[in-house]
């Protein structure tokens, strides 16, 4: 370790003492003091991303799997701007992240150099907390505050802005290695009155239990299953959970539909008891469709994402099983009909083979509806595993989130089930996967089009034969060669065109170390 301890050393030393073990970084000149200090402060793994959105998405995936914050290190306002989309997704997932932004030296800011910007204003919409350090002496207190704020329930991004002169200045005091790691405080308990009211309502009418956050933990799912057995209620998970355990001996979960008319049909006139989720709203505003998809008089809030939803469901299960004289058959799981099966190799074939081969405790990072929807309809038949989805709708999350999950849990195989259009947003993550030798299988569902946009155009009555409509939603002129692209980033790959070829490629990938890309040529 260098004899001279700087503010950068103090920052990293304090972060390590608070529990930081990984830093996803795309540094620039203003962050070089931190880069240098990483050589001296042991215990924090530096992971280089070639694009800031890779770093922020990886920190999100790391947090979802581990429950603890990673550090991100970004360069000034423009670097932060490049990472904002995945910080938006992380905010929606309630992921704890400590997001460090280097700034110009404090004495240089007034000269308005080309990279100068209002970092606080850029950071605020995606951050639960924004803290600016003004001097080296403030660093240790600021990093502790950032950790504590990020871990406060339900979890958030804490952005810490540190000017380069504060990082380069001598440390006011050495970081204490004896400092206690930052931990999440226990979730807030749901009041007894709310439990009793939920039990009263669920005993009088047909009900749907809508689960999110920790209601989707094993405890939450099993308690919800007991409630369903006692009352005949249906159990539905939110459309895009941050992370959910599926398969094995866990209960089968219905998934909330996407389009508003499908949600209203799915829920019918049942009253909806919300645990760890939000009341259903339409993803977009559609003419003639309401934004709120369940009337207020049919909603009961059992718990919010910042409350102990699993415990609340267990307490509710005790209430309803005590008052119920007989077990009722749970309502059948409603599974949407799949579109008429196309000939040849289809998304259903991809989903089916994944279900058959997925190893125990695997992690699936899912982005895109082409293969995602058919997979989630079948996931209950797989071995027990975890699924992460795109919580905020900003595409380009799937591959970086899988990267972060692989670093958080190196003993689990990660599968990125990824649509080809959104994969291009953060394709640089492939390079980091190769460099870090991560056990990740990338299944690229290559239909060479923006399928969701084509669906939306059809719903609006717009023909896809129009020159602009076709030109703006097709990705086949030229087609992206995913195998060559992966090879260029250091990831071996194979292109498959039949279910049999996919079966063999998937088996080979799951039994080989390191990353591998499988390009599935789909209709």
Predicted feature descriptions by range:
Residues 87-89, 147-148, 262-264, 354-357, ...:
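Short amphipathic alpha-helices and their capping/turn segments at secondary-structure boundaries
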Residues 2-324, 440-442:
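N-terminal alpha/beta PP-like core and its mobile active-site loop of ThDP/TPP-dependent enzymes
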Residues 68, 205, 362, 412, ...:
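Surface-exposed loop/turn positions
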Residues 2, 137, 276-372, 468-471, ...:
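Phosphate/pyrophosphate-binding active-site segments
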Residues 79, 105, 165-167, 214-216, ...:
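Short, glycine-/Ser/Thr-/acidic-enriched flexible segments
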Residues 100, 108-115, 230, 374-523:
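Thiamine diphosphate
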Residues 8-21, 26-30, 34-39, 330-411:
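Active-site diphosphate/adenylate-binding microenvironment
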Residues 51-52, 111-112, 184-197, 256-257, ...:
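A general structural motif
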């Amino acid at each position: 370790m260098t004899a001279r301890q700087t503010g950068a050393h103090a920052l990293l030393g304090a972060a390590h003492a608070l529990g930081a073990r990984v830093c996803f970084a795309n540094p620039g000149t203003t962050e070089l003091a931190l880069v240098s200090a990483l050589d001296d402060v042991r215990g924090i793994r530096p992971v280089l991303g070639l694009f800031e959105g890779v770093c922020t998405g990886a920190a999100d995936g790391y947090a979802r799997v581990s429950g603890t914050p990673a550090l991100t290190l970004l360069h000034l306002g423009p670097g932060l701007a490049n990472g904002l989309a995945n910080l938006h997704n992380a905010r929606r997932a309630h992921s704890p992240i400590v997001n460090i932004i280097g700034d110009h030296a404090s004495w240089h800011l007034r000269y308005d150099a080309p990279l100068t910007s209002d970092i606080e204003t850029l950071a605020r919409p995606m951050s639960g907390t924004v803290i600016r350090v003004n001097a080296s002496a403030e660093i240790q207190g600021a990093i502790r505050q950032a950790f504590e704020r990020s871990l406060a329930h339900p979890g958030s991004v804490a952005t810490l802005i540190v000017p380069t002169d504060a990082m380069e200045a001598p440390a006011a005091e050495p970081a204490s290695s004896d400092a206690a790691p930052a931990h999440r405080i226990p979730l807030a308990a749901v009041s007894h009155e709310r439990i009793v009211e939920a039990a009263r309502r669920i005993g009088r009418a047909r009900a749907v239990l809508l689960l999110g956050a920790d209601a989707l933990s094993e405890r939450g799912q099993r308690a919800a299953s007991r409630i369903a057995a006692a009352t005949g209620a249906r159990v539905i998970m939110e459309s895009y959970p941050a992370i959910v355990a599926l398969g094995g001996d866990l209960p089968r979960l219905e998934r909330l539909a996407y389009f508003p008319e499908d949600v209203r049909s799915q829920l019918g006139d049942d009253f909806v008891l919300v645990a760890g989720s939000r009341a259903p709203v339409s993803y977009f505003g559609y003419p003639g469709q309401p934004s709120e998809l369940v009337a207020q008089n049919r909603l009961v809030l059992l718990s919010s994402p910042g409350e102990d939803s699993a415990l609340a469901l267990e307490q509710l299960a005790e209430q309803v099983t005590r008052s119920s004289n007989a077990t009722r058959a749970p309502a059948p799981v409603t599974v949407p009909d799949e579109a008429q099966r196309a000939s040849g190799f289809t998304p259903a074939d991809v989903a089916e083979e994944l279900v058959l081969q997925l190893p125990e405790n695997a992690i699936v990072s899912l982005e895109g509806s082409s293969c995602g929807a058919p997979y989630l309809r079948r996931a209950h038949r797989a071995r027990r595993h975890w699924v992460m989805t795109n919580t905020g709708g900003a595409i380009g999350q799937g591959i970086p989130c899988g990267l972060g999950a692989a670093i958080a849990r190196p003993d689990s195989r990660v599968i990125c089930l990824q649509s080809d259009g959104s994969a291009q947003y953060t394709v640089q993550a492939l390079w980091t996967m190769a460099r870090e030798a991560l056990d990740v299988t990338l299944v690229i569902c290559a239909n060479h089009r923006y399928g969701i946009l084509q669906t939306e155009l059809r719903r609006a009555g717009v023909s896809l034969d129009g020159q602009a409509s076709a030109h703006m939603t097709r990705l086949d002129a030229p087609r992206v060669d995913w195998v060559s692209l992966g090879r260029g980033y250091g990831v071996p790959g194979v292109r498959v065109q039949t279910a049999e070829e996919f079966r063999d490629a998937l088996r080979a990938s799951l039994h080989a170390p390191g990353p591998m890309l499988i390009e599935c040529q789909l209709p």
